[in-house]
Amino acid sequence: IIIGAGPAGIFTALEVIRHKPDQKILMVEKGKPVDKRHCPKAETGKCMNCKPNCMITTGFSGAGAFSDGKLSLSYEVGGDLPTLIGEDFAQELINYTDKIYLEFGADEHVEGNYEGEEIKEIRKRAIRAGLQLVNCPIRHLGTEKAQQLYLNIQNYLQEKGVEMLFNTECD
């Protein structure tokens, strides 16, 4: 049983399927399937405080379905994971996760690997200011593509036999 169909729940289900394909999986999610989530703010121009749950943050893929979907592909940004598990292993996990996103339809184009004289000059100025300019490759999904990508994952999980119980809150 997996509680929540946000990123942690989704990737847990994917890993169980890969390593124990015969294992029965039930995902319990208090929100809706990704293809049934529509924020009324797009039509009204203001937050309607959806009840019982916000359509932006709750449902399959969590807030990721409505984000612009930027995936940072370097261990050098984003938190303490490299300190906790080591830089090499952190990068290995980032690459592994990125590969999964590609399998489900992420654009192969990566931005953020910029070089050239202008970047070298900015890097020098950053060093003089006590800062570090980090080249960070970014895979940009885009809001529309993120929703389709998560729908692809949702459909895949269901095809693999994952039972999904939506609109169900756990106490």
Spans of model-derived segments:
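General beta-strand structural signal in soluble alpha/beta enzymes
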Residues: 27-29, 74, 135, 164-167
